[in-house]
Amino acid sequence: MEKRQELYAGKAKSVFRTDDPDKMVLVFRDDTSAFDGKRIEQLDRKGMVNNKFNAFIMTKLQEAGIPTHFEKLLSDTESLVKCLDMIPVECVVRNVAAGSLCRRLGVEEGITLTPPTFELFLKNDALGDPMINESHVESFGWAKASDLAKAKELTFKVNDVLKAIFAEGGMILVDYKLEFGLYKGEVLLGDEFSPDGCRLWDAKTKEKLDKDRFRQGLGGVIEAYEDVGRRIGIDFDA
């Protein structure tokens, strides 16, 4: 597989064409951003950690019958993925109240949400990724109703699988965001799953083990990511 020209660079990953029009290479960089890209820093080993973390999680999800774009690891910082027509919407599930939910609704952090909440956000940095609803998605043509329904179904299936995996490692999956796209008409999970895009707390101490450590200036960001990975069986030195 030959990596060719760069298609685009996001906040923490770059995407490259290959000699196969149906495949792309994701390159995970050491860049770390917060507040819609207003704060950016380089954290040593982050690209490698997130690449291997994502590969592990995507493989677990595929084994559970959840279709993803992930194909295989190419190197410490590169993965081969299917080329998707992305839906410009983030699907967010919250198992525990935290982050923007607390700010918007004035609820206390740490409240268990039963059942978990499902939210949609438009991927638009200039607008601050505004919260939207399913009617907006269909009315503005961002996705067909059937494709959005499938994405929602898969988002909750992911929740069932990952809550169990992280619980075995002594952690709480507080919330997470997912992105989906179409591959030959099928809705697949795209982008990545790493501590950059979810909240994870130690089940006993409630210590934050995710990107909130960067947002809130707690330090030890990559050490926390590696701790999470080791708890669920990832060997970052392999």
Swiss-Prot record:
Any single Gene Ontology cellular-component annotation: cytosol
This protein's pathway: Purine metabolism; IMP biosynthesis via de novo pathway; 5-amino-1-(5-phospho-D-ribosyl)imidazole-4-carboxamide from 5-amino-1-(5-phospho-D-ribosyl)imidazole-4-carboxylate: step 1/2
Q: Does the keyword Nucleotide-binding apply?
A: yes
Please give the start and end residues of each transmembrane region: none
Q: Which GO terms describe its biological process?
A: 'de novo' IMP biosynthetic process; cobalamin biosynthetic process
Q: Which residues form the signal peptide?
A: none
Gene Ontology MF: a single term: ATP binding
What EC class does the entry list? Answer: ligase
InterPro entries reported for this sequence: SAICAR_synt/ADE2_N, SAICAR_synt_PurC, SAICAR_synth, SAICAR_synthetase, SAICAR_synthetase_CS
Reactions performed catalytically: 5-amino-1-(5-phospho-D-ribosyl)imidazole-4-carboxylate + L-aspartate + ATP = (2S)-2-[5-amino-1-(5-phospho-beta-D-ribosyl)imidazole-4-carboxamido]succinate + ADP + phosphate + 2 H(+)
EC assignment: 6.3.2.6
Alphabetized UniProt keyword annotations: ATP-binding, Ligase, Nucleotide-binding, Purine biosynthesis
HAMAP family reported for this sequence: SAICAR_synth (MF_00137)
Q: Which family does it belong to?
A: Belongs to the SAICAR synthetase family.
Return the protein name.
Phosphoribosylaminoimidazole-succinocarboxamide synthase
Q: Which organism is it from?
A: Marinomonas sp. (strain MWYL1)
